[in-house]
Swiss-Prot record:
This is 1-(5-phosphoribosyl)-5-[(5-phosphoribosylamino)methylideneamino] imidazole-4-carboxamide isomerase. It comes from the Bacteria. InterPro entries: Aldolase_TIM, His_biosynth, HisA_bact_arch, Isoase_HisA-like, Isoase_HisA-like_bact, RibuloseP-bd_barrel. Belongs to the HisA/HisF family. GO terms for biological process: L-histidine biosynthetic process; L-tryptophan biosynthetic process. CDD domains: HisA. The gene is hisA. It catalyses: 1-(5-phospho-beta-D-ribosyl)-5-[(5-phospho-beta-D-ribosylamino)methylideneamino]imidazole-4-carboxamide = 5-[(5-phospho-1-deoxy-D-ribulos-1-ylimino)methylamino]-1-(5-phospho-beta-D-ribosyl)imidazole-4-carboxamide. One of its GO terms (cellular component) is cytoplasm. It is an enzyme of class 5 (isomerase). It is found in: Cytoplasm. Its EC number is 5.3.1.16. The active site is at D8 (proton acceptor), D130 (proton donor). The keyword Lyase does not apply.
Amino acid sequence: MLIIPAIDLKDGACVRLRQGRMEDSTVFSDDPVSMAAKWVEGGCRRLHLVDLNGAFEGQPVNGEVVTAIAKRYPNLPIQIGGGIRSLETIEHYVKAGVSYVIIGTKAVKQPEFVAEACKAFPGKVIVGLDAKDGFVATDGWAEVSSVQVIDLAKRFEADGVSAIVYTDIAKDGMMQGCNVPFTAALAAATSIPVIASGGIHNLGDIKTLLDAKAPGIVGAITGRAIYEGTLDVAEAQAFCDNYKG
């Protein structure tokens, strides 16, 4: 399982939100490229970037920062989400050296777009499913739909999606542990690899995720915990690598 540091971008800075609320943000750095360097030096094998402004506006806003990080680390797999709602945007990021694009809102509102994107950019597409009480949320989590996460995830199995990033909104930024039972259930219900996100606080939470014995869970995204020092990236990755269960 990969430990994936998150860099959330808002107005060009690296921030963390609580439960997806833009008005409840903490700025951790005005230099996201240097922050990326910190996690790379800490031994991370993949980075998770989110354009928060883009998620709300429906198009990239912090794209220059994303491109700068991708150019600085050409051999590091980088995944970007937030405001990706057109093939042109995907093409822009892929050409900039980004490994994966995360389709969220558009995947819910127009699921056929995912198949289209996978066909145009095979191996590059991740679907981001953000949920509240098992129902998918969209538009920067501002809207909660009537669509159930597992039902939607199954729909994408034939499309060639590389992974699903599953975030439990109630847990995100709260550092109270991620929703392990539902994450494991999602991984069991679909053939698509699942990346857990939201709420990881410390090594104990990583162990709980591994103890779920869900082979479909291939990664864990962590944000506030690594910024506030309750989780060390290198230590957590070593723990995953050596985990025997």
